[in-house]
Amino acid sequence: MADNQYYGTGRRKSATARVFAKVGSGDIVINKRSLQDYFSRPTARMVVMQALELVDMTGKLDLYITVAGGGITGQAGAIRHGITRALMQYDESLRPTLRKAGFVTRDARRVERKKVGLHKARKRPQYSKR
């Protein structure tokens, strides 16, 4: 790997993102598509850009991202986590800022399993007193 390339792996729910960052003009390519093409939902685009906007790196790094698994929200969260790790590899002094915003910690919440005798993970059948 080149010296001027920075890498970060991000995970969220069942999604995994691999983020490669290089000093550049601010291009973001996700699975060989642009950010706008890949995420049509504006909230997902906002989540992806949060870490970059926080440390004012929006137009300074080119990002090449591969993401697999999960849905839109999980993939957006995984990309944000991966970007955060790549930024910390690029400049370790950004860590406290990113930590304070909560981007460094992996979101460990997962889907709770459905239990036998229940409709969903916690939804119970209607109770009849008589």
UniProtKB/Swiss-Prot annotation:
GO cellular component term, pick one: cytosolic small ribosomal subunit
Keyword Ribosomal protein: yes
Keyword vocabulary terms for this entry: Ribonucleoprotein, Ribosomal protein
Superkingdom of source: Bacteria
Transmembrane segments: none
GO terms, biological process: translation
PROSITE patterns found in the cross-reference section: RIBOSOMAL_S9
Pfam families in the cross-refs: Ribosomal_S9
InterPro entries noted in UniProt: Ribosomal_Su5_D2-typ_SF, Ribosomal_uS9, Ribosomal_uS9_bac/plastid, Ribosomal_uS9_CS, Ribsml_uS5_D2-typ_fold_subgr
An example molecular function term from Gene Ontology annotations: structural constituent of ribosome
Keyword set includes Ribonucleoprotein: yes
HAMAP family on file: Ribosomal_uS9_B
Family: Belongs to the universal ribosomal protein uS9 family.
The protein's name: Small ribosomal subunit protein uS9
Annotated organism of origin: Tolumonas auensis (strain DSM 9187 / NBRC 110442 / TA 4)
Phylogenetic lineage: Bacteria, Pseudomonadati, Pseudomonadota, Gammaproteobacteria, Aeromonadales
